Regions:
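Aromatic-rich peripheral "rim/lid" segments of glycoside hydrolase catalytic domains that contact
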Residues: 48-69, 73-74, 84-130
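Structural recognition of the beta-strand scaffold that forms the well-ordered cores
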Residues: 34-38, 81-86
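Alpha-helical structural signal in soluble globular domains
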Residues: 25-28, 69, 73-77
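Catalytic metal-binding/acid-base residues of hydrolase active sites
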Residues: 41
């Protein structure tokens, strides 16, 4: 059986793959195009059961660093002009763990994905005409 540590390791690999994919498209940036990330953010579908390791991984404190690394990696390479999350608030299910938070009244101390996004946000400029 897979454990939470292994799931988190797979998320870290996925972050590196996504940054690499964005770098592969960097030639578009040279032509004054900007990368807009639509429906971005973590997914990590699981079985939807109570003991689902994927859901546990999304709730794990290490997700803060994984998401911060993702956003910072994209920004560091000049690859993000806008990011549109699939959903900012949503309960995990067998279809994925899309939300940065699971409920609008979730205690931020227990929302590591939201913390990771907030940690990486200060340098983001406002998006004009959006």
């Amino acid at each position: 059986m897979v454990n939470v540590t292994e799931v988190l390791a797979s998320f870290r690999l996925a972050v590196n793959e996504q940054i690499k994919t964005a770098q592969d498209h960097a030639d578009l940036l040279q032509n004054k195009f900007k990368l807009v990330m639509y429906e971005g953010g973590p997914a990590g579908a699981g079985s939807g059961s109570v003991d689902d390791m994927c859901m546990a991984a999304h709730r794990h404190p290490d997700m803060r660093g994984i998401l911060a690394e993702y956003y910072e990696g994209m920004r560091r390479n000049g690859l993000v002009s806008a990011l549109v999350h699939f959903v900012s608030n949503g309960k995990p299910s067998k279809y994925g763990n899309w939300g940065l938070i699971e409920a609008s009244d979730q205690d931020p101390r227990f929302a590591p994905k939201q913390q990771g996004r907030a940690y990486s946000t200060p340098a983001d400029p406002p998006i004009p005409h959006c």
